[in-house]
A protein has these predicted regions:
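Short, small-residue-biased leader/transition segments that mark boundaries at the very start
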Residues: 1-6
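Conserved micro-motifs of the catalytic ATP-binding
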Residues: 8-11
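Short helix-loop "hinge" at the ATP-lid/N-box region of the Bergerat-fold HATPase_c
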Residues: 27-28
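Short beta-strand/loop element within the Bergerat-fold HATPase_c
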Residues: 34-46
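Short conserved segment of the HATPase_c
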Residues: 59-71
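Short alpha-helical Gxxx[C/S/T] motif in the catalytic ATP-binding
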Residues: 88, 92
Length: 128
């Protein structure tokens, strides 16, 4: 485990934990048994980045554009895994956007799948 000092991110703690829990659960659910899950954070002085990534089961390119759509379910589930509702990533993105952030799938040379949460260090405006 590596740690580094990060500035405090002004976000709704329970909402952020819910999103992180969803992303971690998806990494377990869609990854392979021999895969690895990474959770990393960094900042660029104005924004905080939190990556939840896993190895072992890449998302097909044609599904990456639809992955945040409500009710969309990926085709790459682990054999025998219980199917979800297809709402988790859509709700997670909405939650992050309520905190003036973004949730996207990004490329990462160390992982097959990487979801990145990007949040401002200072809120642009108060949550509605």
């Amino acid at each position: 485990v590596q740690t580094c000092a990060l500035p405090i991110c002004l976000a709704e703690p329970m909402l952020l934990m819910s999103v992180l829990d969803n992303l971690y659960s998806n990494a377990v659910h869609y990854g392979t048994e021999s895969g690895t899950i990474y959770i990393r954070s960094n900042n660029n002085g104005s924004r905080v980045f939190i990556d939840v990534a896993n190895t072992g089961s890449p998302i097909p390119d044609d599904e990456k554009t639809m992955i945040f759509e409500p009710f969309f379910q990926g085709s790459h589930q682990r054999k025998g895994a219980v199917k979800g509702s297809g709402l988790g990533l859509s709700i997670a993105r909405d939650c992050i956007r309520r905190m003036q952030g973004e949730l996207n799938i990004v490329s990462d040379e160390r992982a097959d799948v990487c979801f990145r949460i990007e949040l401002p260090l200072e809120p642009e405006k108060s949550m509605k």
